[in-house]
Amino acid sequence: MPEGRTLLTMDPASSFGTGSHATTRMCMEQLDALTLDGARILDVGCGSGILACTALLLGGRHALACDIEENAMRVTAENMDKNGLSGLRYSTRCGDLLSDPALRQELGGQGPYDVILANIVADVLIAMAAYLPGWLAEDGHLILSGIIDTRAEEVRRAFRQAGMVIVNEIARDGWVMLCCMRGKGENS
């Protein structure tokens, strides 16, 4: 392994997130480009927990991983353990933040987050534009992926209307990743 790199060990079980899909890889590349020392992370739609694990291994202080699938909570915990990340550095929540006001209040109340990750389909991301930007720290980064290229403009529009500015965009294999911040960058 090259010097200065960190090895991530994953078992996705039946949850999404092996690290081989373009959407996951782009999110991981964006995380690697950020300074995460001491960062508070929210991973929405965590699947196997791969993005939360990556953020912690890159210096994040705490990650909250949320998914609608109960199995994702178990798989995320197992993958955190495989990577030497104690339960004090992460927590998990199961539920659908779009349909559960109590979960939205809990997730929002634990913010602000320095990094919010959401690698989910475009329709869900567009609906989450009503919540995620408000949970982001002033200089935080919102990393969105799971966006098929034909839907990217809809997602861009939804988050721009929510006050976000796209500071980085990666497209690969028909998929798009957007990294957004509040009112910063050139792509407003």
Regions found by a protein language model. Give the residues of each.
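S-adenosylmethionine
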Residues: 34, 68-187
